[in-house]
Amino acid sequence: MPCYSLMVQGTTSDAGKSTLVAALCRILKRRGVRVAPFKPQNMALNSAVTVDGGEIGRAQALQALACGLAPHTDFNPVLLKPTTDKKAQVIIHGKVAIDLDAKAYHAYKPRAMGAVLESWARLTAEYECVVVEGAGSPAEINLRDRDIANMGFAEAVDCPVIIVADIDRGGVFAHLVGTLELLSPSEKNRVKGFVINRFRGDIGLLESGLTWLEARTGKPVLGVLPYLHGLMLDAEDAIATAAVGGKKAAKLKVVAPAYPRVSNHNDLDPLRLHPEVDFRWIGPGETPPAADLIVLPGSKAVRADLDWLRAQGWDKAIHKHLRYGGKLIGLCGGYQMLGRMIHDPQGLEGQPGSTPGLGVLAVETTLEAEKQLRNVSGHLSLPGRPAMTGYEIHLGVTRGEGLAKGAVELADGVHDGAISADDQVFATYCHGVLDHPEALTALLAWAGMSESEQVDFAARREADLDRLADSVEAALDWEKLSALLPG
């Protein structure tokens, strides 16, 4: 039986591609279709560890969840993780292959395409349907040559395409018509229709525009998706800063620095979304405010982001915070920043050299070429030994007398991270440590919140995937889509 495939491309970044693919995956899964997600090439600092011991973009991990599948490297065979403004770490089938600048990567693309097609062959042999996500826009003229992320891939595997645009940004008709006009004749023929995302208001006021769009392009509008508030789904690129509804009176104030190369920022979503936590990301130029808890998130360029912290006054603010009895959490790169020194002799994250840390923990970190990648479970070294789950993605090895009391006892008996002797600092390499309801409740109590309600964000994420799927299923024209999708 042949495998169905459908590719969702967008007029811009953040148009709704990831969300629409997740919705389609959940809809098809609920209809009994064996479906898998796929993104040929992704560029993101947020990644997830896969069941086969690699890493992929978090959007594909979420889409796998929508399919009822464990994340696998075939779902995102090429992942680019920027290390500077001009250079990125190239990850092929979940493993670091090479670091390249943009020009060198352009020459490398044929090899990357080989990895993409290998994964595609495996997925289409195993599943009834594969829903594909493009990257950015297919109309980027300067990126058309050797494209493996959008139409270059779709043409190579003969995959039909729908294009999604975000009406909330404005200019939706110009985006859709302009994108189509910049495609080649064969690529235009590959486009089977449009989806308009994040509409709010009276749909009747949009009808004349939809009629014009269909007449102008000869392509059907397959659906107008409503603006959905309060979805708890992982953001892959931009840090989520939108106000969260349903908040109660805050029992704890938490802040985190939004440094330039912050990675896996979704680690902090449970704090941002918790009904009793006042959480804020603090950007460049903002004075670090007083808080009960400061969290230093992960970083893809720890030494550079540490320099940024100092330039923004965070080093002084953190030491003052601790003098006044505040609590401090460091996650992965944030953990490394808390030590006395960070060494990068091979220049894995920039120029070779060493940078003094914040000196909060008596440890030093050396970055090594072999990346640690694994899913973990265990218990926090806090009262009641609360359960935790998470994952590790890091280059560093941390050593020193500051590790006398580990922060996490993993299921294999290994102790990870550190809790300071004065009990003010909790540091771990484990991403996702706040996702488990027991771990989150315990860490909030450690930080000073009494009697917090236990919130299960994994259950909330599942419920929101269903809410998203319900909304998209009701909005799409399934009669027109029936030729493109099974079920």
Swiss-Prot record:
PROSITE patterns: GATASE_COBBQ (PS51274). GO terms for molecular function: ABC-type vitamin B12 transporter activity; catalytic activity. Residues 251-439 form the GATase cobBQ-type domain. Pathway: Cofactor biosynthesis; adenosylcobalamin biosynthesis. It comes from the Bacteria. One of its GO terms (biological process) is cobalamin biosynthetic process. The keyword Transferase does not apply. Keywords: Cobalamin biosynthesis, Glutamine amidotransferase. The keyword Transit peptide does not apply. The active site is at C332 (nucleophile), H431. It holds the Pfam family GATase_3. Belongs to the CobB/CobQ family. CobQ subfamily. NCBIfam families: cobQ, PRK00784.1. Catalyzes amidations at positions B, D, E, and G on adenosylcobyrinic A,C-diamide. NH(2) groups are provided by glutamine, and one molecule of ATP is hydrogenolyzed for each amidation. This is Cobyric acid synthase. It comes from Dechloromonas aromatica (strain RCB). The gene is cobQ.
